[in-house]
A protein has these predicted regions:
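N-terminal secretory signal peptides
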Residues: 1-16
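Short hydrophobic alpha-helical membrane-entry/anchor segments
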Residues: 41-42
């Protein structure tokens, strides 16, 4: 057995041992890993889950990573096509399906053969790690359909995003053909998944831009806070009934059970914000910073009275449109901007909705008058159609191609 084979065998032996031994979640956390258990989300209540042991199936009616309770980390990548050969891309999506179901189960993407002169099939940085609730979500842009000659299959709702007021988009963060969103409670697990998927498609796709991010979700019972210190996602829909009304596309074509993802890379001018007094910060949002409650109310989830909010506050302008969306955003920090010497940090805004026009109307209203624009700059943008879920035996995007 080669060194590489011994290295990768450790993970398989460990996982097989745990399955055969039948070690429970809390017992594993205390007896083996030493890590404390944590609450998964509100719906699971007090159920203790061993750190990283929970697996989220890749197969299902809908893709995971959309209405899935948020994980702590994201690795988000947008790809450009290097080929327009439909058969090559079908095979790539089949390969990605095979890899994905293994990755979310915490397995290697492929076992190595006996030739020690070849590179390992899996890059190996997650050997010994658990799945950490990894989800992988795939989508394609309108340009993907055009390049593959599938323009006739483009849904009427799938229109290009218009130019929004005050945005300053940079070409390197705008557009692209394919999106892969990897979310997990361990940053390395998320990165490893994307790394191996791209490695498999290296002759068919190339990376346009990527972004790692994090969410301050704590024990998953509190709304995460953004880098301005305010709760982000309070107004999100949370029930299956609401998901059907807001998130999942009303479609009988290849977008059935899918959703449209709008993404914005937003720089947050932290130094400017940090020089702003508390009252002005709260006026910008229309909520109290500590509790997250809307002005005039006591609790975070109390109904918003628009008449009590400043006319240019973020919450008021978003609520005026009265079109709910599902926000699934992550903060990011990319070191220091060499031009300004300030933090290169902000928000990877991600929203899912059944109709992209929901996002367009909200962003149009915000872009014109939102006081928040004094503290943020939108530099990246994209709109992607995220397929419905994958059936066992099927593959990602099968309904589009067939």
């Amino acid at each position: 057995m080669t060194k590489d084979e011994k290295f990768f065998e450790k993970k398989m032996d460990r996982r097989e041992f745990l399955k055969k031994a039948g070690i429970g979640g809390a017992g594993l956390a205390l007896g083996l890993s030493g890590a404390s258990a944590f609450f998964a989300n509100k719906e699971q209540g007090s159920k203790n889950i061993a750190d990283g042991q929970e697996e989220i199936s890749f197969y299902g009616k809908h893709q995971a990573g959309i209405t899935t309770p948020m994980q702590k980390n994201i690795y988000f990548v947008v790809l450009d096509l290097r080929t327009t050969d439909k058969n090559e891309l079908i095979q790539l999506f089949k390969d990605w399906t095979d890899y994905s179901q293994k990755l979310v189960n915490g397995e290697l993407v492929k076992k190595d053969g006996s030739n020690a002169l070849l590179p390992p099939s899996d890059t190996g940085e997650t050997v010994g790690l658990n799945p950490y609730r990894l989800t992988l979500t795939f989508g394609v842009s309108a340009s993907f359909l055009t390049k593959l000659g599938l323009e006739k299959k483009r849904p009427k709702l799938f229109r290009d995003l218009p130019a929004f007021p005050k945005e300053q988009l940079r070409e390197q963060y705008t557009g692209g053909d394919i999106v892969i969103q990897a979310c997990a409670d361990d940053e390395q697990v998320a990165f490893h998944a994307v790394r191996n998927l791209i490695r498999k498609g290296r002759n068919k796709v190339t990376m346009k831009w990527s972004q790692s991010g994090f969410a301050a979700i704590g024990d998953r019972t509190e709304t995460p806070r953004n880098l301005f210190g305010f709760k982000d996602g309070t107004a999100n829909v949370t029930t299956e009934k609401d998901f059907n009304k807001v998130v999942w596309a009303d479609s009988q074509d290849w977008m059935k059970n899918g959703s449209y993802m709008a993404v914005r890379r937003i720089i947050m001018h932290l130094e400017t914000w940090d020089r702003t007094n508390l009252q002005e910060q709260e006026n910008t949002f229309g909520r109290y910073k500590e509790s997250g409650a809307p002005f005039g109310k006591k609790n975070e989830f109390d109904e918003v009275d628009l008449s009590l909010l400043p006319v240019d506050s973020h919450v008021r302008l978003a609520k005026e449109v009265d079109l709910p969306i599902l926000r699934r955003s992550y903060s990011y920090s990319d070191g220091i901007d060499p031009k300004t010497g300030q933090f290169d940090a902000g928000l990877l805004f991600i929203a899912f909705q059944k109709d992209p026009d929901r996002f367009v109307k909200i962003q149009t209203n915000l872009g014109a008058d939102d006081k928040m624009n004094e503290y943020v700059t939108h530099i990246g943008s994209g709109l992607f159609a995220c397929f419905g879920g994958v059936k066992e035996g099927g593959y990602i995007g099968q309904e589009l191609f067939e």
